[in-house]
Regions:
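Patatin-like phospholipase
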Residues: 1-45, 50-256
Length: 256
């Protein structure tokens, strides 16, 4: 008589974009660890790709929190005029390399993928091979704010244009359960105070409908209420982490 051992579900974690709101992802990671939930695959779009890079490298939520709390806007951006964006995110790539080294997708501890958009043909590009730092730079290039990144023959901008909550890469990996974090589900568009916020508001209008189309494919959806938070104020990072943690803890308590 053959006895079949029940196979453990392979869990995929999808981390959405949302600029500085991405700090809430760190709180979600804390809740996952406290529930002894191990992630087998991770995907990220925009700031979600930035966090996913650290997850893929095996960093703990405490290590990622320490990095997030130290971040300043000037650490991840620099003036790039007269190029195709107000700012460059080359500093972000440098920060990743300084923290993680020259890590590639192939050498990551956890299989990972990031989503970007080809600004020439409008197609979604799933990045899961080669250098992780350049993939994150491409996925975080909010159109008009950051200059596009050239990679593998593509001119790439933020993946949130087409799939802000990156579900499809996890399906491609073969995840049995997908936990998705949508940072903008409750976010209210506010009157902008500067050109960056004008562009972010425009970007938000573009990605809202696309997000809804994909989030209904998640098995567990975590939507922190960040309606009163700014997408550019880094002083609120500790509060965002706590909101992400409390929201995820409540949902995971009900599911596991």
């Amino acid at each position: 008589m053959r006895i079949f051992k029940k196979r453990k579900k392979r869990i995929g974690l999808a981390l959405s974009g949302g600029a500085v709101l991405g700090a809430a992802h760190v709180g979600v990671l804390r809740a996952l660890q406290e529930h002894d939930i191990s992630v087998d695959f991770v995907s990220g779009t925009s700031i979600g790709a930035f966090v996913a890079a650290f997850v893929a490298a095996g960093k703990t939520w405490e290590e990622i929190e320490e990095i997030a709390k130290r971040l300043k806007w000037l650490d991840v951006s620099g003036i790039s005029l007269p190029q195709m964006g107000l700012l460059s995110n080359k500093k972000m790539g440098k920060l990743l390399k300084e923290t993680l080294g020259d890590i590639t997708f192939e050498k990551a501890q956890i299989p990972a993928a990031m989503i970007a958009t080809d600004i020439v043909n409008g197609e979604k590009v799933i990045l899961k091979e080669g250098d992780i730092a350049s993939a994150v730079m491409a996925s975080t290039c909010i159109p008009g704010i950051f200059a596009p990144v050239k990679r593998e023959g593509h001119l790439l901008v933020d993946g949130g244009v087409l799939e802000n909550v990156p579900i499809t890469p996890l399906q491609d990996f073969g995840a049995d359960m997908i936990i998705a974090v949508d940072l903008i589900a409750h976010h209210h568009i506010q009157e902008p105070d500067n050109i960056v916020e004008v562009l972010l508001n425009t970007f938000d209008f573009m990605i809202t409908n696309a997000s809804r189309m994909y989030t209904n494919q998640a098995d567990i959806l975590i939507t922190p209420n960040l309606s009163g938070a700014s997408r550019v104020n880094m002083d609120q990072i500790p509060e965002l982490i706590e909101i992400g943690y409390e929201t995820a803890k409540e949902i995971l308590n009900a599911e596991f």
